[in-house]
Amino acid sequence: MSEVISEALKNARKIVIKIGSNTLAKDDGTQNTEFMASFASQCKKLIDQGKQIVVVSSGAQVSGVSTLSEWARKKDVHFRQALCAIGQVELMTQWRKAFSEQGIHIGQLLLTKEDFENDHRSLNIRNTLFTLEDEGVVPIINENDSVSIDEFQIGDNDNLSALTAILWSADLLILFSDVDGIFTDNPKTNKNAKIVEVVENIPELRKSIRIGEKNAFGTGGIETKIQAAEKTTVYGIPILLANGSHENILTNLENGTAKGTLFTVH
């Protein structure tokens, strides 16, 4: 089935790639700058093939903790929002460094739920994405966590990336996390869990798997990834789930040597 995944990536020209917090964090909670550099290099190879890339990057809070470790245990919402404000600067600094080494400029978009619900704002986002891509700039998107409150939150970057893919009319959405894809059970606790390589029917998938809780650093989990697939597949955009921590994951997905779960469209 890796051939199906390989073909999906090869056939896509406009690709949105979401990178989860666990992929961007090392075990000690600091930024995984090695991954960021490798990822930018792999993106350059895709861009050289004529593909366009939009990155949806989590990691503001992780980057904030890396900078101000003494705030790590603070639970107050104002501290968390302030931590994201500090961390977003650090996050973009590292992304700028990673992509500049490949001769690529980046542009930042911090978005909220309101931006997608307002026709004028969403049109401006779409136009900005098209302009950046036409000029060879890679957009890097995150939710504006410092100003978002519960009723105006998208809440997780799986759904943010799905909304972005739909708005930009992407050909493929890739969700990177710390697991290889969707399994019949949690592979970290059940060694007999099997990967689901291709999903053609989401309601049937829900009946056949066990959905666990969100991960340590992120706000999502398997449930939010399925929600994202429910959004994009309606618009003819397949979703690929894969483990971003694997070395050269983008390249290996393209050549068919990496595992993943592909939500297909009909």
Predicted regions and their residues:
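C-terminal catalytic "cap/lid" subdomain
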Residues: 2-73, 77-105, 109-266
